[in-house]
C-alpha cells in the first residue's frame, strides 16, 4: 500500500499526474482543491467560506484545511493507498501530517513561474458540468463550448493575474520550507514538470522505483493526443465528487 504526497505550484499538473498514478496503482487521489471547489459549486457552508478566500487569491487557513484532510482520511479505505495533493502547504500543516500519517514519498513537480502563468491563464471550466479544460492542450470542438454538455467555458474564478501573483508569492514563502522538511527526511523526488504529461509520469515512476506506464497509441492511431502539452481538455473537474 503506497502513500504519497504530490507537491508543485498551481498549474504544474499535480492533478493529472496524481490521477495517472492512482489509476495504475489503486491509489485514491485526494485533492484538497477539488474538495473545496465541490463545496463552492454546491453552495455549502464550507463552500461559502472558501469562495471568499479564493476570490481574494489567498490560501485557505490551516484549521480549515486540516479539518478537511482529517475528515477525508478518516473515511479512507486503508486497503488502498493514497496520493494527496494540495496539502501540506506550510510548515504547520507538514508537522501535523507527519505526526498523524506515514508516507512513502513526496513528488515535487518543479516549474518556473513564467510557465505557471502561461498554463494557469489558459485553464477553463465548464459552467454546466464542471469539466476542466486547458486551451494549451486541446481546444473544445466548438470554441467556448463544453464537448460534454455544451455549457459555456469560463475561467476559474481564482484564475486572474492578480490572484495568481498572490498565490505564487504565498507558494514560495510557505511551501518551499515544507519541501525542506520533507527533504531532511529524504522523502522528496523532484521532477521537471514542463514536458508533456507522459514524459513527466515516466520520470516520476523512475524516481519512485515504480514500473513504467504503458504508453498510449500515437495520436493518429488512437484518434487523440499522445504526449501533448500539459493539462487536458475534458478532464473531470469540480463537477465530480470531491477528492476522488
Language-model region placement:
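Conserved lysine of the Walker
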Residues: 14
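NTP-dependent small-molecule kinase module
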Residues: 152-244
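Short glycine-/polar-rich loops that comprise or flank the Walker A/P-loop
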Residues: 1-2, 100-105, 183-188
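ATP-dependent small-molecule kinase phosphotransfer cores
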Residues: 28-102, 114-115, 121, 125, ...
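Cys/His-rich short segments
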Residues: 118-165
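P-loop (Walker A) phosphate-binding loop of NTP-binding proteins
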Residues: 9
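Hydrophobic anchor at the beta1->P-loop junction of P-loop NTPases
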Residues: 6
Amino acid at each position: 500500500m503506497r502513500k504519497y504526497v504530490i507537491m508543485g505550484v498551481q498549474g504544474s499538473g499535480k492533478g493529472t499526474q496524481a490521477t495517472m498514478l492512482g489509476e495504475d496503482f489503486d491509489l485514491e487521489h485526494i485533492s484538497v482543491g477539488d474538495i473545496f471547489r465541490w463545496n463552492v459549486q454546491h453552495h455549502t457552508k464550507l463552500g461559502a467560506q472558501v469562495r471568499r478566500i479564493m476570490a481574494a487569491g489567498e490560501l485557505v487557513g490551516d484549521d480549515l484545511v486540516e479539518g478537511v484532510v482529517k475528515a477525508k482520511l478518516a473515511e479512507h479505505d486503508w486497503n488502498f493507498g493514497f496520493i494527496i495533493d494540495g496539502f501540506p502547504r506550510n510548515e504547520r500543516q507538514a508537522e501535523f501530517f507527519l505526526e498523524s500519517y506515514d508516507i512513502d514519498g513526496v513528488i515535487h513537480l518543479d516549474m518556473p513561474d513564467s510557465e505557471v502563468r502561461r498554463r494557469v491563464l489558459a485553464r477553463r471550466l465548464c459552467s454546466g458540468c464542471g469539466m476542466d479544460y486547458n486551451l494549451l492542450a486541446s481546444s473544445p470542438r466548438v470554441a467556448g463550448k463544453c464537448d460534454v454538455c455544451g455549457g459555456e467555458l469560463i475561467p476559474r474564478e481564482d484564475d486572474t493575474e492578480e490572484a495568481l501573483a498572490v498565490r505564487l508569492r504565498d507558494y514560495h514563502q510557505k511551501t518551499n520550507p515544507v519541501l525542506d522538511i520533507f527533504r531532511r527526511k529524504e522523502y522528496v523526488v523532484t521532477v521537471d514538470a514542463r514536458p508533456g504529461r507522459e514524459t513527466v509520469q515516466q520520470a516520476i515512476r523512475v524516481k519512485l522505483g515504480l514500473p513504467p506506464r504503458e504508453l498510449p497509441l500515437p495520436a493518429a492511431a488512437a484518434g487523440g493526443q499522445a504526449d501533448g502539452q500539459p493539462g487536458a481538455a475534458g478532464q473531470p473537474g469540480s463537477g465530480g465528487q470531491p477528492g476522488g
